[in-house]
Amino acid sequence: MAKKVQKKLPRRKEEFTYHGYKIDELRAMSLEDLLPVMPSRARRKVLRGWTIGEEKLLSDIRSNGSRIRTHQRDMIILPEMIGREIEIYNGKEFIRVELQPESVFHYLGEFALTRRRVTHGSAGIGATRSSKFVPLK
């Protein structure tokens, strides 16, 4: 009569792969070896060359700086950046973002949104015709 209760095992998170490459394999590749793996938009940006700001950001990441703040929203997330915390400027403040393996070859700006959703409140007194005659307290 006693039923055996099976414990649900936690789901095993599979290791992230990008086009069949694990993140460690992507990190070991040189930039020239990464080009065929990249999406075309990221590949064209890399082939154009880095700007001065992007080169500075890459050197900061490679030098293991503890706090990295940047305005370079159009920088491609490279495999060597994965696992780092970067603060990205959204026009008003710096948004702290931890770069996950799933974000490889995306732009930094995709993770620090510049606009927020508008939440309208209720209408004020006198805003509608029916609320003109509501007695004020």
From Swiss-Prot:
One of its GO terms (molecular function) is structural constituent of ribosome. Pfam families: Ribosomal_S19. InterPro entries: Ribosomal_uS19, Ribosomal_uS19_euk/arc, Ribosomal_uS19_SF. The keyword RNA-binding applies. The keyword Cell inner membrane does not apply. GO terms for cellular component: cytosolic small ribosomal subunit. SUPFAM superfamilies: Ribosomal protein S19 (SSF54570). Keywords: Ribonucleoprotein, Ribosomal protein, RNA-binding, rRNA-binding. HAMAP family: Ribosomal_uS19. Belongs to the universal ribosomal protein uS19 family. Protein S19 forms a complex with S13 that binds strongly to the 16S ribosomal RNA. This is Small ribosomal subunit protein uS19. It comes from Methanospirillum hungatei JF-1 (strain ATCC 27890 / DSM 864 / NBRC 100397 / JF-1). The lineage of its organism: Archaea, Methanobacteriati, Methanobacteriota, Stenosarchaea group, Methanomicrobia.
